[in-house]
Every structure is written in C-alpha cells, then in structure tokens.
C-alpha cells in the first residue's frame, strides 16, 4: 500500500462564490440605504465587477460582499480588493476585483519551505499549481495541515485529494 498523501491547493469554490454573490445582491436589493441606487455585483470568469452610485456606496457593497463570502467560508486572500475605483457609465463608479486561482511558483516554494523547516517526516513535491505532501504516518500529515493553516501565508490554502 502506498503512503498517505494529500494536495495543498489555492482555489475558490465557484458554487460558493456564486451563492455569496447572490446573497449579497439580495441584501443590497432589500437594504434601505441602497434603495434607488444602481449598485450591482457581476461575476465574470476571472473577476468580480462591483458597481455603485458613488465610492461610499461602493465601499458598502464591498462590506456586504465580504461578509457573505466570510459566512460561506471563502478565503478573502484570493481576492484583490485593492484595485482602483474607476468611473463607469451613467455617473456610477466601478471596481474590478481580480480572483486569484492556483498557486504561483513562489507560493508553492513557500509551502514546501514551511513543510521542510518543520522537520516532520514528510515529503513535499511541487506538482504545477499544487504541492503534494506524502508521509508514512497520518499524524504527520495532520500536523502539516495544522502548520499550514496557522502559517501567515499571503494566500489561502485548501487541502484536497486525501489518499
């Protein structure tokens, strides 16, 4: 029998993101401070497009969306909320929030460095946009999961493909 393993990935659950956007739109539609405003959230392939009447209302849209994402368990580190607010048609303002998918090469190296510095008896192998962790004991793998969850990484990690 092969050694137990799992993959460390950084991705967003698309159905959960769709649910969070739908819930945020529902709240925006029903809230008193948004009555008569042109506030909207659109989910595109690689980004979210947030639109509102002015910057203050756009900040409120962001707050509503972030709270719904947090309730649905979506990691906020995979979204770039620091993009600039730009004018849009009809006297509105717009913000494009980039969705980060997968781990870049530096991020996979960071994960393997953390695992190797832990001195646990596990192997970390970079496999494209994920890192495969293998070890003799499941307890060691659980320690790696705990270690990575508690690490202050600039991106969110999920654990998949348990074997």
Swiss-Prot record:
Domain of life per record: Bacteria
Gene Ontology MF terms in the entry: nucleotide binding
GO CC annotation terms, alphabetical: cytosol
Database matches in HAMAP family: YajQ
Record NCBIfam families: PRK05412.1 (NF003819)
One Pfam family matching this protein: DUF520
Listed name of the protein: Nucleotide-binding protein LA_3406
Family matches, as InterPro entries: DUF520, UPF0234-like_C, UPF0234_N, YajQ-like_sf
SS bond list: none
Keyword match Nucleotide-binding: yes
Organism from which the protein derives: Leptospira interrogans serogroup Icterohaemorrhagiae serovar Lai (strain 56601)
Family: Belongs to the YajQ family.
CDD domains: YajQ_like
Keywords: Nucleotide-binding
Keyword tRNA-binding: no
Function: Nucleotide-binding protein.
